[in-house]
A protein has these predicted regions:
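N-terminal Rossmann-like dinucleotide-binding module
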Residues: 1-43, 47
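Proline-centered loop/turn at the N-terminus of a beta-strand
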Residues: 4, 31-34, 54, 84, ...
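Short alpha-helical
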Residues: 14, 42-43, 64, 93, ...
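Donor/substrate-binding cores of folate-linked one-carbon enzymes
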Residues: 22, 84, 88-160
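N-terminal glycine-rich "phosphate-gripper" loop used for MgATP/nucleotide binding
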Residues: 37-38, 61-62, 66-67, 80-96
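Short, well-structured alpha-helical segments in soluble
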Residues: 71-79
Length: 160
């Protein structure tokens, strides 16, 4: 039975597109119920539409604070029938209340091998350090940026 997934994204949606492509190839068993984007005009919106997946554009600047925004996002996730949340280039920290609404069901895709090179510049930081091996990490999200338990990692040779 596939995971019922909500995808939170802020930008171009390349991670989201990779998920869609993997589902279509039959190598990822998820049902993407909704994409929630916090930035109007982000390319992920077009990608979701092209894939036939509902996309809710929820501009975070239209809420008075992070807590009320995260409550609205959690409500949208629940209304879509999703039980797991994937952060795919989502450039916002989540509140403890959001994480508690989906305990051990929020994952992040990070473009570096954690615990090395956390943060929004992880890939660039790895390159700046001159690492010979880099990769990506999928991990559970907790209240500390890029800190939660690692689910899976993939290592590849670094290229300059």
């Amino acid at each position: 039975m596939p995971l019922k997934l909500a995808v939170l994204a802020s930008g171009s949606g390349t991670n989201f597109q990779a998920m869609v492509d993997a589902v279509r190839r039959g190598v990822l068993d998820v049902d993407i119920r909704i994409v929630i984007c916090n930035r109007p005009g982000a390319r992920v919106i077009e990608r979701a539409k092209a894939a036939g997946i509902v996309c809710a554009v929820m501009d975070h600047t239209q809420w008075p604070d992070r807590a009320s925004y995260d409550r609205a996002v959690a409500d949208a996730v629940r209304k879509a029938g999703a039980d797991t949340v994937a952060l795919a280039g989502y450039m916002r920290m989540l509140t403890p209340d959001f994480l508690n609404a989906f305990p051990h069901r929020v994952i992040n895709i990070h473009p570096a091998l954690l615990p090395s090179f956390p943060g929004i510049h992880g890939a660039a930081d790895a390159q700046a350090w001159g690492v010979k091996i880099t990769g990506c990490t999928v991990h559970l999200v907790d209240e500390i940026m890029d800190h939660g338990a690692v689910i899976v990692q993939a290592a590849v040779p670094a290229v300059a």
